[in-house]
């Protein structure tokens, strides 16, 4: 599926990027251990290795690196977005950054890493989820938000933002050296 998305994006001249939540999989799906679900099936690798909430064993960190390196090697994304917790594993995340940035030199094209917490904004593009900044930033930054006022996906009865609200946010964000990643949920 990723390969097909990359091919379609490139056909249209769109820069191809990926989002990875692999690190959060270590604890995010643990609730599925409390009732019968596919999270309990150890033959399914979708969920990665498990750990207690926000405790990252070496196995979990190595799994994160292997999975992320595989995505880089197979698909050469020009952008990788991380939600939440990469700041909790600085040694491993620094290895990822070095690998990805060195790959970009081999490819002869620039790359971008988006993350939320704990890294200087001259190393990667900081992300503010569903928020804005009070003033302009020297380095580029991003906010990610959804057209839904409360959800990222389908919720019965969800109220969407108006076009005027979205345009107002976009103008404010861009005027402060930011960009808007807009989720259009189902």
Positions of predicted regions on the chain:
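Mature catalytic domains of secreted/periplasmic carbohydrate-active enzymes
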Residues: 1-186
